[in-house]
Structure formats: C-alpha cells, structure tokens
Amino acid sequence: MFHLSRRAVLLGAAAALAPRFAWAEVDNEDAWFNGTITDHGVTFRATNMGMVPAVFRKQLVHYQHNQRAGTIVIDTNANFLYLALENNQAIRYGVGVGREGFQWFGEARIDRKAEWPGWTPPPEMLKRQPDLPKYMPGGADNPLGARALYLYRDGKDLGYRIHGTTEPWTIGWDVSSGCIRMLDEDVIDLYGRAPIGTKVVVMERVS
C-alpha cells in the first residue's frame, strides 16, 4: 500500500508524482536504510542495498558504445546511468528520471558541482506547489541529497541536475521534474569520477 505522507510533501516535492507509480513512497521507509554515514561533516542514513533491486545497484557492465571514456550516458527507458569506460565497459547505476511531461533528451555538460548542495525550487515548481520553501540549505534532509552535478548547454544552465535523494525507493522509477536522481552513495561515487566539463548524453525515450 502506498500513501502520501507529510514528509513526502516536504522532502519529495522536488520529484512529485509519477503516472505509473502513484507515489514512490512506502509504508516502511526505515527498511530502506541501514546505519549512518558521515560525509564532509554531514551524517546521513545509509541505503540498505538489500532493498534495492539488484539491477539498479552500481556495477561494472559490458556496454557497447561509441563515446569517449568518461562520458555519462543516461538511458531514460531503462532507468540507467552509464559512465563509459574503455573497451566497451561502463559503470552502471540505477536512477530515477523525469516523469511524463518532464522528460528531455540531448547533450549537456557538467559545468558546476556541489557537495551537500542547497535547493532553490524553480519558479514553475513554486507555482505548482506554493507550499514549498523558497530555499532549503544543504544537509541530510535536502531533496538534492549528498551531491549535485549541474547540467549546462552552450554555457546556459538547463535547470537539470544529477543529484542524490532522500528517497532511495524511487530509484528505477519515472519520478522527477527532469532531474536525474541517484542513491546518495552512488552520486558520491560518480561525483568523484566526473570532473567539470564531462559530457552528458540523455537518450531519447522510446515509447
């Protein structure tokens, strides 16, 4: 059974509803966490990886591609993010992607990175959800999670980020307003592998 909790309104607002998954919110949230991790002075709840479907856990895979090593490729159909490596290999992560009406595709570049980023909801989101805070400082309860990689095109901020999440049960679902969300542990890992200037390719969705 799924429900919309008060916590979901406050902390899951950055993602909102997914048509195929009424709310990526579960009754027993605590089951998705196991202990804590302290990172750069912030203590956050560690993901219980046993709750994450094996296909969406970080893993080294064979991946046929024609991208330069270090390129990030996001498969919005399968909810995978690939970090391309040499010899047709990649590190694959499970991700949450944009819900219907908020999907996008094309090329971008990481032009900014932040650890424990603050969150400023965009004006269009505030219009849809006027109860949201105008700004939320970075920390363990911030919807952007432990890291954010900011996506630009031709020097312009697209408004989309690759970021962590306080809701690990949403990985593998179409849940966001266009951002790419990852487990906090995974986005910390990717953050260390993807420097400023990294090319990002978001594949077009196939109906």
Which residues does each PLM region occupy?
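N-terminal pre-domains immediately preceding structured catalytic cores
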Residues: F2-S207
